[in-house]
Amino acid sequence: MDRLDFMQACREGGRAIERALRALDAAYFDVLFREGLRTLRDTEAARDAVQETFIKVWRRCSTFQAQSELLPWIRAILRNDMLDRMRRNNRELSLEDDAVSVEAERRIDELSSQAIA
């Protein structure tokens, strides 16, 4: 599928965009999945990122510009999705680290109290 066909499908909507997305999936899934796997290092996370990317392609198809190429545009969406995922994971890891630190401090206080007593 070329960019003009994609733009036409976006304008038509409905089944046309569904067919376009299936064609894009068939053409680009493997490339996008490998990029996702290389970045995220997790099969399920990479698969989820690619699926989410195609959902975003569908939602944002009206923003695609004629002078752009499809694959770089889709890859940019994927990269942004992966960055968001990594930020969320870092926040979750940071919160877990904070919880461990609080627990460690509590335990140190207990042991200090026992040593003094």
Give the residues covered by each predicted segment.
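Internal acidic/polar
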Residues: 1-6, 84, 91-117
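N-terminal module of bacterial RNA polymerase sigma factors
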Residues: 1-31, 38
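Conserved RNAP core-binding helix
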Residues: 3, 25, 33, 43-60
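Sigma70-family region 2
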Residues: 14, 38-41, 52-69, 88-90
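Amphipathic, non-transmembrane alpha-helical scaffold segments
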Residues: 21-29, 75, 113, 117
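Structural recognition of an alpha-helix C-terminal capping motif at a helix-to-coil junction
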Residues: 48-55, 68-80
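Arg/Lys-rich amphipathic alpha helix in sigma70-family domain 2
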Residues: 59-66, 76-96, 109-110
